[in-house]
Amino acid sequence: MRRIRIFDTTLRDGEQTPGVNLNIQEKVDIAKQLARLGVDVIEPGFPLTSPGDFEAVQRIAREVEGPYICGFSRAIIRDIDETWKAIKDAQKKCFHIFISSSDIQIKHQLGKTEKDVLEIVKSTVYHAKQYTDEVEYSPMDASRTRLEFLYEVIEAAIDNGATVINIPDTVGYATPIEFGELIQKIRKNVRNIDKAIISVHCHNDLGMAVANSIVAAMNGAQQIECTINGVGERAGNAALEEVVTHIAARKDYLGFETGIDLSQLYKTSKIVSRYMGIPIPVNKPIVGKNVFTHESGIHQDGVLKERSTYEVIDPRLVGRDDSVILLGKHSGRHALKVEAEKLGYDLDEERLNKLFNDFKKLTDVKKNVTTADLESLIIESAAKAVEEAYVLEKIRVVSGNIETPSAKVVIKDSKGNLLEAEQTGNGPVDAVFKAINSVIKETENLTLYKYSVSAVTEEMESLGEVSVTLREKEKLYTGIGTHTDIITSSAIAYIDAINKAIAANARAQKN
């Protein structure tokens, strides 16, 4: 059976989702989970975007084993040299070189000609090949590129060392039949295409990313590029969990398979959702809350008699296990560490100590702590992997329908000083945020960009998880807070986002 390689770009293309700004520890955690999932290639970021991105790619290259770690680079010699410094320590490494190839992008974005682009591709692919055996080349906007030029530039890339040719539908313009025919034409008209793997990278602007990816594979593509939960710019990318589950469910018809451990899908989806602060829609295929829920009486009757009557896959196949492990106030550090490892988190001593303290605080207000609660605490801990300039010490809120909501906060700064403030607002959360703003001077240039709330479990005493994104000019900072009291969660998340903004500005000044 033909094997399709899975190239994950959650940490590069996926992180370009508006409002997403992962810290280094979050990126490392996601990369390690992608390795457990079994992806063939991880594109961990764009190293030259910032010193933080460079460090994240470098750490992933050093710490993550199994998949290829792919360095994403513009078709510029000096960029390739610098990108190599970020990926060189990886067990398995490769390059991904890209440049626009469509008439509209060559003319209006690059200000060049097709001849210019052809020469750039030859020289940069050859240069990258001097560093590593595997080099991927992407003619960006391939689905809108003049076919004769597309064939020519692909041939030139392969002649100069490219081992993977990626065909991007950059703006999600193609339809499935059309995209499948494009792959066929490339296989037929590119003289040396047998010397390279054909990859596809589909965007979802017209809702066809997964369909285009599957049809491309049916027509000979050997690698599919995708992201967890379909995250990415604009309408996102092909959703990895949908692509690989479709291949697994219909391998009898499709005749190919992947190396993905499907049982890790749901866990990976949740980690990415929480770190990025993007809730999973309830009807999202494979990982949405309602996907295996049956409301119709006829459907319920059928599922009770035989699950396959209305479920095309067993939920357990993709890691949708409803079993719950309960921890309580008498649970020790070892039990906590074991459960964290079962969830896929390898915690060092510092992170374990922090988690244990947070866990003990939670058991004071919640009798039983579930695996979902524990995972939420771990994710919140990773989200706070920056030096905390401010920490919430106390909070008191007065609210109701007969008086103006007010909030009092006590915040400790990095020097141990306690800062107090009380404010009223248009609701308790607004009052809390105004109180925080009144004592933290660094909030002057920050504005609220996004606020979302979700319950970690469905119990009455469930942890409430809040994601707050703040904007400072063109930069976005996302904080996460969890607590059984949603107002407290909001305050924690708000201060977390502020701390990230402060840390980012400090790094920028240092550099």
UniProtKB/Swiss-Prot annotation:
Catalytic reaction list: 3-methyl-2-oxobutanoate + acetyl-CoA + H2O = (2S)-2-isopropylmalate + CoA + H(+)
InterPro entries named in the record: 2-IPM_HCS-like, 2-isopropylmalate_synth_dimer, AIPM/Hcit_synth_CS, Aldolase_TIM, LeuA/HCS_post-cat, LeuA_allosteric_dom_sf, LeuA_bact_synth, PYR_CT
Localization terms from the record: Cytoplasm
Family: Belongs to the alpha-IPM synthase/homocitrate synthase family. LeuA type 1 subfamily.
This protein's record includes keyword Manganese: yes
Alphabetized PROSITE patterns for the sequence: AIPM_HOMOCIT_SYNTH_1, AIPM_HOMOCIT_SYNTH_2, PYR_CT
Function (record text): Catalyzes the condensation of the acetyl group of acetyl-CoA with 3-methyl-2-oxobutanoate (2-ketoisovalerate) to form 3-carboxy-3-hydroxy-4-methylpentanoate (2-isopropylmalate).
Stretches the record annotates as Regulatory domain: 391-511
Top EC category: transferase
NCBIfam families reported for this sequence: leuA_bact, PRK00915.1-3
Domain Pyruvate carboxyltransferase: 4-266
Residues that hold Mn(2+) according to the record: 13, 201, 203, 237
Cellular compartments per GO CC: cytoplasm
UniProt pathway annotation: Amino-acid biosynthesis; L-leucine biosynthesis; L-leucine from 3-methyl-2-oxobutanoate: step 1/4
Molecular function GO labels: 2-isopropylmalate synthase activity; acetyl-CoA C-acetyltransferase activity; manganese ion binding
Cofactor: Mn(2+)
Name this polypeptide is given: 2-isopropylmalate synthase
Known partners and oligomeric status: Homodimer.
Cytoplasm is among the record's keywords: yes
